[in-house]
């Protein structure tokens, strides 16, 4: 068994309807130190069923880097600030990564 601590980093996936909204959400998460980094990927296209109808929408995919201790507050914050009734909020655990990056991530959230 390894003596290395388990990684507590998470990546949260969220989509936003446009660049301005994604930027506003990202700034809010960074200012409150709920996220260490937010990557905005414009040009995403989402296809899904909503209320029985097939929908297709251009969106901005957000990759939000945080940790488990900030996870619930971050999800709550996004639900309160997001314009969608049911925003995409998916938490992906990080099983490992570059130790320098993970150290920076943790320090950025303090």
From Swiss-Prot:
Cofactor(s) recorded in Swiss-Prot or TrEMBL: Cu cation
Function: Involved in resistance toward heavy metals.
Residue numbers binding Cu cation: 14, 82
Name of protein: Divalent-cation tolerance protein CutA
Quaternary assembly: Homotrimer.
Keywords assigned: Copper, Cytoplasm, Metal-binding
GO BP field: response to metal ion
Superkingdom in the source lineage: Bacteria
Disulfide bonds: none
Family: Belongs to the CutA family.
One Gene Ontology CC term in the entry: cytoplasm
Originating organism: Pectobacterium atrosepticum (strain SCRI 1043 / ATCC BAA-672) (Erwinia carotovora subsp. atroseptica)
Co-factor binding details: Binds 1 copper ion per subunit.
Intracellular or extracellular location(s): Cytoplasm
GO MF, any single term: copper ion binding
Main location: cytoplasm
């Amino acid at each position: 068994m390894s003596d290395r601590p388990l990684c507590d980093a998470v990546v949260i996936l969220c989509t936003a309807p446009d660049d301005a909204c994604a930027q506003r959400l990202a700034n809010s998460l960074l200012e409150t130190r709920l996220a260490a980094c937010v990557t905005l990927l414009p040009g995403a296209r989402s296809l899904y069923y909503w209320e029985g109808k097939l929908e297709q929408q251009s969106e901005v995919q957000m990759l939000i880097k945080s940790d488990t201790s900030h996870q619930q507050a971050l999800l709550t914050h996004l639900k309160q600030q997001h314009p969608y009734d049911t925003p995409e909020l998916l938490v992906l655990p990080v099983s490992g990564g570059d130790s320098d990056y993970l150290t920076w991530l943790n320090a950025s959230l303090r």
